[in-house]
Amino acid sequence: MAVKHLIVLKFKDEITEAQKEEFFKTYVNLVNIIPAMKDVYWGKDVTQKNKEEGYTHIVEVTFESVETIQDYIIHPAHVGFGDVYRSFWEKLLIFDYTPRK
């Protein structure tokens, strides 16, 4: 059964919109490199609710299973992405779940 991997981000104040675009363009391209990643969506919060924590963006990745998330975590392309872009965010939340209706 598919698993959704959500990443909610609060970027550092000094990160520009151009840098954020670069961040997301590079991250979305990981789906072409890491077989475990089946689909990726990202976006910016469009409401003004719950802004006190400063989170502004979200990424949603689809994996085939919990086990394939582990393949993604240790994949050299994912590790390399983190090495380059870790300094962009002030904090993030990660949540993995199995969708239900």
Curated annotation (Swiss-Prot):
Specify the Stress-response A/B barrel domain's residue ranges. Answer: 3-97
- CC terms in the record's Gene Ontology section: cytoplasm
Tissue specificity here reads: Expressed in glandular trichomes and at lower levels in female flowers.
According to the UniProt entry, its GO molecular function terms are:
cyclase activity; lyase activity; metal ion binding
Catalytic reactions of this protein: 3,5,7-trioxododecanoyl-CoA = olivetolate + CoA + H(+)
> Looking at the record's lineage, which domain of life comes first?
Eukaryota
Annotated residues that bind Mg(2+) are located at: V31, I34, M37
Q: Which SMART domains match?
A: Dabb
> Altering H5A: what's the impact?
Total loss of activity
Q: Look up the record and name the pathway of this protein.
A: Secondary metabolite biosynthesis; terpenoid biosynthesis
Q: Which PANTHER family match?
A: PTHR33178, STRESS-RESPONSE A_B BARREL DOMAIN-CONTAINING PROTEIN
Function of the protein = Involved in the biosynthesis of cannabinoids-related terpenophenolic natural products, which have pharmacological activity. Polyketide cyclase which functions in concert with OLS/TKS to form olivetolic acid. Has no intrinsic polyketide synthase activity and requires the presence of OLS to produce olivetolic acid.
The name of this protein is: Olivetolic acid cyclase
Instruction: Please tell me the species this chain comes from.
Output: Cannabis sativa
Report the gene name: OAC
